[in-house]
Structures are given as structure tokens and as C-alpha cells.
């Protein structure tokens, strides 16, 4: 009877992929029955229900096999995010860069203090603050399309989101030595690991970005192969980052930044991933929900609420402060700050990195960060809609959008 499967049955990666997609699609469908509940929250709730804290269909071993799928999802999302950071725009509008750095710094300082007062060790509080300074472009782009928003606030906020995520990773890397020291790591790990991961990921991302640009530029007549070059470049970069123990988050982010700033005609950055991109997006959030520990989430619920309120005030306050100093319109500053409130991809990725480097801190950090992600992705859409109306940019986009532009907008929102 050797031909029969062993018991208990173990799932391979392909089975896990199918399971995550089916469960995620179910969660997304159910979320559509409630107008106030975004699909992202539905994905996370279904993951929590079927994860180790719920029905345990997705146990720890199954989730471990989904890592490659989550890495691909994060790589694609962060590559798209990197395409939002145009350095020439920052040179033209210096105050935009100052605004991004000031708002990010204020958020890190305030969140660190609040979490420290709440009982977190100072290094861990700083690490969580570095994670949650990141912002998600998904809500911004999706709601902008829904309300037909267009204008200065809409475009410049994309750059601020990219700045937030770069600052998040840099601050996370800078704070790693403090957490490692408090965890009793060796000095070689404390000093060399963050340096190696940061500069190694930077070099890998720059190299991959240059290669993707050259390949797509030299073969620009064969447009049918551009998507293969881009997807292949992102996956190769993510894979090499794992092989060399670099950051599978920062490297694809840098890849996107390099491609965007090398090209002159946006031929690569406008490439559409298509509906298949949504599949990995579903996998990412179902996996994130499954990794939540219900007991820790309930225990730390007051901290999550405190984090949500404090981070929101810091984001808006930082942008408004710089705008006031530069005499910019208050309504536009408040709108930008509100559009920076949603949080998702980078935060989830850095939470996974924290769990890998510091298993003893994984449960509490995941409960706080992922709990906040669920809240921010729920309140994000109505906040964004209000922000676009406040800025006076809702309804300003062309009423008749081309199918190509529409596909690009929807894809980026994913």
C-alpha cells in the first residue's frame, strides 16, 4: 500500500496557493456584502478564521510553505511603489521632500514614545514605529479612480507615500542593532548584519534596475516581451535577496525607483501586470490575517487603538506643520496627511522580517502592526474620499477615461 499518501496529509506550495486564493476570494466576496468593509479587511478576516488561531486549516507548516508566494506579492507591490518616486520632482519641489521627511520623523518619534509609555521596551517600540511610518498607495489610487480625483494633491501624495516607505526601511535597518543588543546578539550580528542587508539590498536593486532598463530599452520594438522582463526582474531580484540574506522588501523597491528615474518616456513604468497581479495581492493579505494570534490581538487591542489614533494625528500634523511654514493651503495639507494614513504592504513585510529575526517579539509586534493594518484599511477609503473632496480634486479627472488608463489605474490600486 505504498502508493497511498502518508497521514497526516501535508500540503505542497501549489496546494497552499490554491487554498489561499479560494479562501481569499470567499473573504473578498463576503466583504462586498458590507459597503463599509473593504476587501483587504475581508482577506485578513478570512485568514484569521482559517488560521492557527481559528479553524487551523492554515496551520504553521502550511503558512511556512506560502512564504515564496508572499515574497512574490511583496516584491511586485514594492516595485510598483518604487515607480512612484521621481527624483526630478523632488528636485523641483524641495518642500515636498522636506514634508515627507518631517512627517515621517514626527511619526517615528511620537509612536516610539507612546508605545514605550504603554509598556513596550524602547528598542521594540522604536522598531514598531519604524514599521508603521510606512504608507500604502492602494487606497489612494483606488479611491482616486472611484471619485475621479486629479490634481496636485493626488500626484504629490504618491511621492510622499514612496518617501514614507523608504524612510520606514532605513529607520528599521538603523534600529535593528538596538533590538539585537537587547536580545543578546553577538557584536558581529549587531553591527554587520544591518549594514550588509541595507547596502547589499541597495546594490542589488540598483543593478537589477539598470539591467531591466537596458533590456527593455534595447528591445523596445518587441513590446510583447516587456512584461516578461519586468516580472522576471522583480522575481529574480526577490529570489537573489533571499539567497544572499538581503532584504526582499528593499531590493525590489529600489529596483522600481531606478527604473522610473532612468527611463525618459515611461515605457516600462506604464506596463500593466493585468488581473493576475490581484491573485498575489489576495495571498498576501490572507497570509497576514492567518499569522495573527487572536489572544494577543484581543490583549493588545487598547494599544492598537492608541497606535491608530496617534499615528493618524502625527501623519496629518507633520504635513500641516510644514505646509504652514511654507504658506501652503491648509485644506490641501490636511488632505495629503489623511491620504498617508492607510498602511499595508511594507508594514506586513517588515513584520515578517521582525518575526524571522526576533521570534520572541513576533507575536506582540504582529498583533499591534497587523491589527492596525486592519483598522487603517477599513477607515482608509472613506477618509481618502473625504480628503479628495477637501482638496477640491474629486471629479476633476477626465470624464471619459481610456480603457488603457483605466486598466493602469485599477492595477496600481491593487
Language-model features: locations:
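Short helical (or helix-break) motifs at transmembrane helix termini and adjacent helical loops
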Residues: 81, 106-112, 131-172, 313-322, ...
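Hydrophobic alpha-helical transmembrane segments in multi-pass integral membrane proteins
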Residues: 56, 110-116, 168-179, 235-248, ...
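Core mid-bundle transmembrane helix pairs that form the ion/substrate translocation pathway
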Residues: 12-29, 162, 166-169, 173-283, ...
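Juxtamembrane helix-boundary/capping and inter-helix hinge elements in multi-pass membrane proteins
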Residues: 83-96, 118-123, 143-155, 176-187, ...
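Membrane-interface junctions of multi-pass transporters
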Residues: 31-38, 49-95, 216-225, 233-307, ...
